[in-house]
Amino acid sequence: MAEQQYYGTGRRKTSSARVFLRPGSGDIKVNGRSLDEYFGRETARMIVRQPLELVDATEQFDVQVTVAGGGPSGQAGAIRHGITRALVQYDEALKQPLSKAGYVTRDARMVERKKIGLHKARRATQFSKR
């Protein structure tokens, strides 16, 4: 267990991901399953790979992820955030290009709460003039 590993916690909406980067061949495992098996949509898989592709590290690391909460979109965003933080821990020089791409910043957008007297967060009952 002497091999080097880098850790990053990522969050998005209600999802949180714990990401471990270890030197390897580019294998990505999410909750014990392969990336293609875990995410059905290609866009979610693409989001997860973005930070590694940006710094040309797709074949350098094996990625081990534990993700919980939220849906596929939030989980993919959380994993991306975690991978980014782990890459910054690996090499501080990568922070500048990753930050420029907008991967370092935690996406603070959350679901707006439902208000009393409305159907949804903003949807009101239809207005009748007469």
Curated annotation (Swiss-Prot):
Family: Belongs to the universal ribosomal protein uS9 family.
One example GO MF annotation: RNA binding
Superkingdom of this protein's organism: Bacteria
A GO cellular component annotation in the UniProt record: cytosolic small ribosomal subunit
Annotated keywords: Ribonucleoprotein, Ribosomal protein
Coiled coil segments of this chain: none
Record's keyword annotation contains Ribonucleoprotein: yes
Entry's Gene Ontology BP terms: translation
Protein name (database record): Small ribosomal subunit protein uS9
Source organism of the structure: Alkalilimnicola ehrlichii (strain ATCC BAA-1101 / DSM 17681 / MLHE-1)
SUPFAM superfamilies to which the protein is assigned, alphabetical: Ribosomal protein S5 domain 2-like
